[in-house]
Amino acid sequence: MGSIVVMQNSILADTDVLVDFLRGHEKAVAFISEFSSRIILSAIVVAELYAGVKGNAEPAVLENFIFLFRVVPLTTEMAKIGGLYKRDFGKSHGVGLADAILAATADAEKAELKILNVKHYPMLSGMEPAYKK
């Protein structure tokens, strides 16, 4: 008899979750460790991570970390949907463009978006933080 393989959705991790992991926060380390085989990164998240790099050694550490995951490039469709999310939720909910594009990327990839600040994602229903701080 053959075995049944259950495919699980990818997990698109937000920058805050990854920064917590890189800083050694226990809950983030546990989260990334548990789901590492399913985690994907958005090109936007990669840009945000590099924007926060300090010193000369950190870029190499960050590059090695990013290499562990599949990075989803930004497509025109993701940019369009992200722009519409920003238009629709930017003023009313304080949604920034990066968060809007991240939500659009999760939609396009059919991925679970794992974040810390659910207020940034009113366009996605049922959002829960990846872990409680």
Q: Where are the predicted features?
A:
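Short, well-structured N-terminal submotif of metal-dependent ribonuclease cores
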Residues: 1-41, 51-67
